[in-house]
């Protein structure tokens, strides 16, 4: 089904600007910056007893794994909603703690409790805390920038994916709320530019922007045949006996079996080993968190 560009551009014409200026002029208590802290959005209710506690070490490990997978993957991977909520909440709490320490609030509290204030020589732990916090922010920003670059590159593909009723994953699972807003605004601006510059001067039968019948596909899709390095982790929950895909090879080692379509051959991926495979072959295992890109 062709995308009706006139309907899309009509929606864009209703907006006078690409960015809502009212969000920029809010007070300092709700001021946001277009960095990683804004694009992912964060709100975590610590009083929600239904949530399972996850240690900071586990969250950091999961972030590094998601970061590496995103940078090495040719496609846009699903957004880790709960992980990012927890991480941004931890960053907010840690930033507040560092600010209280740097302004001497904790020193005054210690003095009131007949405890000596922290000497200047003891500020080294504070500097280490700030450095570690900035390192975490760097990884999150790099992760979000990588995702935004893929959103820009595969804008039409994501729009087509959203309109496909047979799609295995929805756009709300693939993107965060702010990423969806960014994708919608970016794609509308791009379509308006292409229409005003080129399409409206061409015959009507040549104005389709998602033609896939010619020799060249007009929709940029991820390179499914890209070679990637993978590390086979095994079941993420540690329940080896309950994994139906897990088998034992001739040496008695647990492994996964994948099929290479071009060669029509089966390959055994042993747990704990490293392989080079086409992304399409290990895509399902990556989605199930049974392999990691390196």
Curated annotation (Swiss-Prot):
GO cellular component terms, A-Z: CMG complex; DNA replication preinitiation complex; GINS complex; nuclear replication fork; nucleus
Protein's cellular compartments: Nucleus
Coiled coil: none
Record flagged with keyword Nucleus: yes
Gene3D superfamilies in the cross-refs: 1.20.58.1030, 3.40.5.60
Superkingdom, taxonomy of origin: Eukaryota
Keywords, in A-Z order: DNA replication, Nucleus
Record SUPFAM superfamilies: GINS helical bundle-like, PriA/YqbF domain
GO biological process: DNA-templated DNA replication; double-strand break repair via break-induced replication
Record keyword Nucleus present: yes
Subunit structure, as described in the record: Component of the GINS complex which is a heterotetramer composed of SLD5, PSF1, PSF2 and PSF3. Interacts with PSF2.
Biological role: Required for DNA replication. Functions as part of the GINS complex which plays an essential role in the initiation of DNA replication by binding to DNA replication origins and facilitating the assembly of the DNA replication machinery.
Family: Belongs to the GINS4/SLD5 family.
Entry protein name: DNA replication complex GINS protein SLD5
């Amino acid at each position: 089904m062709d995308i009706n560009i006139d309907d899309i551009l009509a929606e864009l014409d209703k907006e006078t600007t690409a960015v809502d200026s009212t969000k920029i002029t809010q007070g300092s208590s709700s001021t946001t910056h277009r960095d990683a802290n804004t694009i992912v959005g964060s709100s975590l209710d610590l009083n929600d007893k239904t949530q399972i506690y996850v240690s900071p070490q586990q969250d950091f490990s999961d972030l590094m794994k998601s970061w590496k997978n995103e940078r090495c993957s040719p496609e846009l991977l699903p957004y880790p909603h709960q992980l990012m909520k927890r991480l941004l909440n931890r960053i907010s709490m840690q930033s507040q703690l560092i600010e209280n320490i740097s302004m001497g609030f904790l020193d005054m509290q210690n003095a009131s409790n007949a405890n000596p204030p922290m000497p200047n020589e003891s500020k080294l732990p504070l500097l280490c805390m700030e450095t570690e916090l900035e390192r975490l922010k760097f990884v999150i920003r790099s992760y979000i920038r990588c995702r935004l670059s893929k959103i820009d590159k595969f804008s039409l593909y994501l729009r087509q994916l959203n309109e496909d009723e047979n799609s295995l994953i929805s756009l709300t699972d693939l993107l965060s709320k702010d990423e969806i807003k960014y994708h919608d605004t970016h794609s509308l601006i791009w379509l308006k530019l292409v229409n005003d510059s080129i399409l409206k001067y061409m015959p009507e039968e040549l104005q389709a922007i998602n033609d896939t019948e010619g020799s060249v596909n007009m929709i940029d899709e991820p390179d499914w045949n890209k070679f990637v390095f993978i590390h086979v982790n095994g079941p993420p929950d540690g329940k080896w006996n309950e994994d139906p895909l897990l088998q034992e090879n001739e040496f008695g080692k647990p492994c996964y079996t994948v099929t290479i379509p071009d060669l029509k051959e089966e390959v055994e991926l042993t747990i704990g080993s490293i392989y080079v495979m086409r992304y399409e072959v290990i895509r399902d295992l990556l989605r199930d968190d049974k392999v990691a890109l390196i």
